[in-house]
């Protein structure tokens, strides 16, 4: 069994060429507020059911990879992701805590594996972060991550929009915009990662009311951190109407409501000459026409 070394990100300098250009990306999220709310959730006793599910899935996915990973980084996961027998496979694990900055202080080609859970959905410059991870991976190194996306909290979004339009004559952004599967696949390719794969794990959770759901969201540290969020308190009448609409549209026969969480899984490898590559145009030994003639009716 390998002896593990677990370290926190304390690096003060950034290697040349490792910084993305966050100024070029739109600033959607207040990451300082995110950090404060995650700390508040930690002190209050966090809701970890999604992280627990992702951790289990992460362990299974890593066990399926027949590869030894010595140097590993866990990027911005709000809690402990790698532990137990799976973590014992690694020589060192560097945990990078959630921060206001989106600059990863990781030397080039220093990692065999980069993992992250439930963090990338609140990144302003996700293409830049993926590019930084790609540079930090050794050739044939792996990125494996899970983020919230797709139709997550679509019920809450629709209920708030309907209630605000009815009670206040307008709609304010309540739930962050989430990337979908196709977006993430394209970003992996744009970052220069080979063999990109994405899939989605839909989790439907039932609650007694919309207010119970919102309490769980607070305990995840995942309440509204949009820069353009509403800064004034929501009227009580709007909140009550939102909960009523939620129950009318998204409740089961027993009166409990449904909440959707889409966990998008993404993986990609730093390019290496040993990896399978697509055939170049014109390199096939048999043309389609010849194949059709060969297999067609006699």
Q: What residue ranges belong to the model's regions?
A:
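N-terminal, positively charged/glycine-rich alpha-helical extensions of SAM-dependent methyltransferases
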Residues: 2-5, 11-56, 281-284, 288-289, ...
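Conserved alpha-helix/loop element of class I SAM-dependent methyltransferases that forms part
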Residues: 49-71
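C-terminal lobe and adjacent flexible extensions of AdoMet/dcAdoMet transferase-like proteins
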Residues: 59, 191, 211-298
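Conserved SAM-binding loop of SAM-dependent methyltransferases across substrates and taxa
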Residues: 79-90
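A short acidic, Gly/Pro-enriched loop at the edge of an enzyme's catalytic core
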Residues: 103-114
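A short SAM/SAH-binding and catalytic strip from SAM-dependent methyltransferases
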Residues: 112-127, 131, 147
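A short glycine-rich, Lys/Arg-flanked "PGG" loop and its adjoining helix->strand segment in the class I
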Residues: 127-142
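Conserved catalytic/acceptor-binding region of the Class I
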Residues: 146-212, 220-233
């Amino acid at each position: 069994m390998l002896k593990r070394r677990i370290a926190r990100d304390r690096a003060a300098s950034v290697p040349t060429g490792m910084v993305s250009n966050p100024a070029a990306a739109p600033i959607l999220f207040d990451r300082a507020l995110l950090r404060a709310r995650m700390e508040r959730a930690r002190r209050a006793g966090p809701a970890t059911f999604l992280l627990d599910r992702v951790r289990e899935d992460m362990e299974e996915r890593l066990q399926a990879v027949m590869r030894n990973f010595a140097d590993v980084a866990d990027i911005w996961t709000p809690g402990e992701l790698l532990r137990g027998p799976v973590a014992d496979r690694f020589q060192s694990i560097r945990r990078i805590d959630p921060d206001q900055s989106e600059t990863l202080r990781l030397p080039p080609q220093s990692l065999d594996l980069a993992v992250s859970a439930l963090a990338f959905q609140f990144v302003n410059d996700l293409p830049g972060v993926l590019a930084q991870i790609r540079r930090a991976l050794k050739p044939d190194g792996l990125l494996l991550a899970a983020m919230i996306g797709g139709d997550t909290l679509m019920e809450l979004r629709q209920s708030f929009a309907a209630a605000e339009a009815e009670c206040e004559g307008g709609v304010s952004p309540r739930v962050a915009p989430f990337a979908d599967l196709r977006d993430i696949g394209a970003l992996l390719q744009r970052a220069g990662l080979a063999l990109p794969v994405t899939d989605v794990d839909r989790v439907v959770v039932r609650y007694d009311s919309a207010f119970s759901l919102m309490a769980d969201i607070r305990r995840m540290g995942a309440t509204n951190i949009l820069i353009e969020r509403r800064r004034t308190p929501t009227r009580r009448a709007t909140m009550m109407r939102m909960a009523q609409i939620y129950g009318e549209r998204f409740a089961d026969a027993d009166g409990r409501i449904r909440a959707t969480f889409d966990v998008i899984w993404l993986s990609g490898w730093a390019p290496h000459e040993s990896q399978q590559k697509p055939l170049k145009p014109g390199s096939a030994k048999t043309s389609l026409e010849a194949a059709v003639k060969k297999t067609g009716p006699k």
